Amino acid sequence: MRDFTSELNAFEAAVFEQRPFPAERYDDEYFVADWREAHNRYDIETRRQIEGRNPALIKQVFAPRRVLDMGCGPGALMHLLHELGIDVDGIDFSPHSPTLAPPEVRDRIVVGEVTEPHVEPRTYDLVICREVLEHLTVLQARRTVEQICRASSRYVYVTTRFHPEPDGLLSFTTQLDVDPTHITLLNKEFLRCLLVLEGFRSRPDLEQRMDWAGKGRVLVLERQTDRA
């Protein structure tokens, strides 16, 4: 039988060595300056090009009535979904996010920690959390998963940067060369386990449809009402 003790001990040590970034780290310069590769800024037209088919696919695949974007940043995806007639709200812990957001969605962004409850349970039939978890510690990521699932009455759609070569289920790493706040790249199947433990079942068929760019960074799960 495999002994998991050393793997668990290493995981425990690494988890408690992590330190979270304060909200102030995500200021105007973080979102709109040209420091990212390919000038990947958070203004609407740049995000429209980067998002490509995503907003239309979200509407087509999930047919949502109400959407919550957890870790929405300055609301670019919210705005693109709003253009498609989707009722969408957002939560972000940076106080700069609403001020940078388009006026159409600015008042729909709640400033607060994604690790804490801000909405009533099962209020949204789709909860989105994209490119957020890599900015959090493992402990914060676990609490965020809990809040994502708490808010959803049906689907969760998550994307993040995953560990490219994990040695085990508990492996995680950083990606500081891409973004100095990318402190947690989890094993994809570990994150799936966290979502399953909240009472959600994997939907590989929907993951395939949403991962149209073939990046392998998509998770889609659906609530199992009789078990959650």
Residues covered by each model-derived region:
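Short catalytic micro-motifs in class I SAM-dependent methyltransferases
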Residues: 130-135
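Helix-to-beta-strand junctions that scaffold the AdoMet/dcAdoMet cofactor pocket
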Residues: 136-137, 152-153
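Conserved N-terminal segment of class I S-adenosyl-L-methionine
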Residues: 1-122, 126-128, 139-146, 162, ...
